[in-house]
Amino acid sequence: VMGKLTREAVVEQALEIGSAEGLQAVTIRRLAQELGVTPMALYWHFKNKEQLLIGMADHLIEGFVIAEDHARPWQEQLRELVTGLVRVLRHYPCAAAVLEEVDHMTVPNFLRVWDTALGLAKQAGFSYEENCLISKYLLQGAIALAAGPMSRRPSASSEERAECLRVKRATLQSLPPDVYPHIVEMAGPLIDGGTTELYDTFGVDILMTGIETMAARLRTG
């Protein structure tokens, strides 16, 4: 087994454990146990947990790295980047925690994505200062989207979740309609919220519309 152990296999196992149980459960000892190797075999790939977290972050971002393409509209490419980030954050519930733990400057794929985002915002006509703000807002916006009310919580069963939603919906519907007319009227969608896909797509639309509107103002101003 040790001969077959790859850096990628270690990282993927770490992401699985982190997503199911939280990052604190990701230890060299636990990983070695899950992978059927000795801790020393893992130190060959990662000398400590900090290096492992950097590897995890790099692997996460690898899934949506795109190179800046001047032949395609910048809006399309920026949307692709943000959508890719949200998709990765959704797939691995521990992803946001991993990205918060690491120094982004130590993660090669993060630097690639960051550089691409800055280049795309520059194409849109923003100043250097604005480019930097946009890249930060997009990262934080994607993290907030994926951590929002549609995020999956592995601890709750589907039955428990359905019952919890039913109680919340009934609570809102029982509010006095003369005081909270709109909450009572929209109690269903407020609690059910539609699909995760709709939630994420709408959220990315809001982020991108803000940037596109400001870029259009720059062109007309």
Please give the residue ranges for each predicted region:
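Helix-turn-helix
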Residues: A9, Q13-Q51, G55
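Amphipathic alpha-helical interaction segments
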Residues: A9, Q51, E80, R112, ...
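Amphipathic alpha-helical segments used for helix-helix packing
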Residues: G55-A57, V86-T106, T116, A147-P154, ...
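Short, basic, alpha-helical segments at the C-terminal edge of helix-turn-helix-like DNA-binding modules
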Residues: H59-G63
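Hydrophobic alpha-helical connector segments
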Residues: V65-R112, Y128-N131, S135-L138
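A contiguous pocket-lining binding segment that forms or flanks enzyme active sites
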Residues: T116-A170
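C-terminal peripheral helix-coil segments that are non-catalytic and often amphipathic
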Residues: Q123, S151-G221
